[in-house]
Each structure stands twice: as structure tokens, then as C-alpha cells.
């Protein structure tokens, strides 16, 4: 935990940046790269120094984009990142282990890179995650820093989401030809909820009519019989008919 004095000193050195918010996409846009964004609070991850120590500071943001808390977290990284590397992304947990998913980068070793083309940023990410950050957690205090999952099509992103070990907030779209490297916007992801229920089933006098009852014996509805095969199966369970014997 920071003392009030140290916190104020650290925030005075925080880079002056303009945080742009992604617009919601309602219509089809031309994009050739898609980022799957995890669900969780937004945060900055700042590799810097305090006195003579190189540190990684996680700054959690509120919904207005203001810093609501900051803490030092153990992360395996090369010291030269502390020349001033600032990432923006999502903080979330998987099986009680902390993760930070880097969606954007503002400064890299003291150099402002946020206006770089997307392909230039991707090269920086590759350098960082190949050589300068070790994605390892020695205990549950550590933060594992990584990239969101990228796909080349929107449908690939949609089909991939159910296989991920974390909840998803949105899909962010990019056009590699854009010079400023910024996203075209995001599509919020709505998780499909599968509803399951157990009913009491009672056969009606009419053929292929089965009434469904709740646990308090209140009638809910009538079961749908969509095929002859289902009709035979339900008859064999709930009725005694010679043709089914």
C-alpha cells in the first residue's frame, strides 16, 4: 500500500495522456482484425520507478476514467521497461490468479507510441511479450500480463468466445489500413443464457398432448412434440398403448 505522500508523488509523474473511448458499433463496418476484450475493470499498467526500485503499478479506473486506486504488483519484467512504459487494458481474475489484458499502449520505454499505426504497435507488443515480460505467476499476488485474443473475422471471434476461460465484454474492430492505429469501435457481447427446468409431465386424454406442471402443481404449458419419433417415445413413457408394446 502507498502512503498518501508517495501516492501523490507517483501521480504527479503520471504521463499526461488523452484516453479516448471506443464508440459502440451498430452498423456493419469494414474491419480486418478483431480483438476479444475480457470483462473486468479498466486499468493502466505503468512500468516506472519509486526511488531506486523499478516497479509495476496497476491503476484501477472508475467508470468516468479517473484513477480510483493504485498498487504495486509483482510482475516478471525487464528493468528497461521502467524507463516509462504505460499500457491500458482490463484487470480480471481466472481461478483467483490476477491477469491484465493489454488493449493499447501509450508509452514504450519513455517514447510516446499511441499514435503509431496498428502494425507498428503489434511489433512493439511482440517485442515486449517475447523478450521483456515473462508471463508467469509464482503466487496469487502476481499479475500475469498478456494480450487479448485476436481473430481475422468477426464470426471467428463469436465462435471462439464460448471456449474461453473468462467472461467477455466486447469485440473491438480494427482496420489495418488506418494510419492512427485506433479502433473503429466495439460490439458489446451478450452471453446467451441457457435456461433449463424440470417439470412434472401428465398425459392428456387427447393424443400427443402432455401438460407440464411446476413443483407447486401449477400448469405451466403444453410440451411441444416435434416428430413422430418423439411421439412414440413419450407414448411409451406416459401412456400404455398397444402399438408401442
Language-model segments: residues:
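Conserved loop->alpha-helix
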Residues: 55-93
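Nucleic-acid 5′ end/cap handling module spanning
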Residues: 15-65, 92-95, 108, 130-245
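A short, structural micro-pattern
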Residues: 80-83, 99, 165
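Eukaryotic endomembrane system proteins
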Residues: 89-90, 101, 110, 116-137, ...
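Generic structural signal of hydrophobic/aromatic residues within well-ordered alpha-helices
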Residues: 6, 10, 125, 129, ...
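Hydrophobic, proline/glycine-rich low-complexity stretches
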Residues: 1-14, 23
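Elongated alpha-helical scaffolds
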Residues: 98-101, 105
Amino acid at each position: 500500500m502507498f502512503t498518501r505522500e508517495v501516492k501523490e508523488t507517483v501521480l504527479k509523474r503520471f504521463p499526461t495522456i488523452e484516453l479516448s473511448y471506443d464508440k459502440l458499433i451498430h452498423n456493419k463496418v469494414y474491419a480486418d482484425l478483431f480483438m476479444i476484450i475480457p470483462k473486468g475493470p479498466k486499468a493502466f499498467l505503468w512500468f516506472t520507478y519509486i526511488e531506486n526500485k523499478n516497479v509495476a503499478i496497476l491503476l484501477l479506473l472508475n467508470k468516468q476514467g479517473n484513477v480510483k486506486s493504485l498498487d504495486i504488483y509483482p510482475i516478471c519484467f525487464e528493468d528497461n521497461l521502467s524507463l516509462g512504459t504505460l499500457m491500458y487494458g482490463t484487470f480480471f481474475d481466472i481461478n483467483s490468479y490476477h491477469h491484465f489484458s493489454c488493449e493499447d499502449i501509450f508509452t514504450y520505454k519513455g517514447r510516446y507510441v499511441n499514435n503509431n499505426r496498428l502494425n507498428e504497435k503489434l511489433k512493439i507488443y511482440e517485442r515486449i511479450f517475447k523478450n521483456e515480460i515473462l508471463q508467469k505467476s509464482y503466487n496469487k499476488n502476481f499479475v500475469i500480463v498478456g494480450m487479448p485474443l485476436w481473430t481475422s473475422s468477426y464470426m471467428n471471434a463469436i465462435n471462439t468466445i464460448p471456449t474461453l476461460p473468462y467472461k467477455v465484454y466486447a469485440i473491438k474492430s480494427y482496420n489495418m489500413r488506418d494510419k492512427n492505429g485506433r479502433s473503429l469501435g466495439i460490439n458489446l457481447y451478450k452471453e446467451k443464457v441457457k435456461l433449463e427446468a424440470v417439470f412434472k409431465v401428465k398425459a392428456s386424454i387427447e393424443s400427443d398432448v402432455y401438460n407440464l406442471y411446476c413443483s407447486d402443481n401449477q400448469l405451466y404449458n403444453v410440451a411441444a412434440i416435434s416428430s413422430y419419433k418423439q411421439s412414440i417415445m413419450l407414448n411409451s413413457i406416459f401412456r400404455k398403448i398397444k402399438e408401442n408394446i
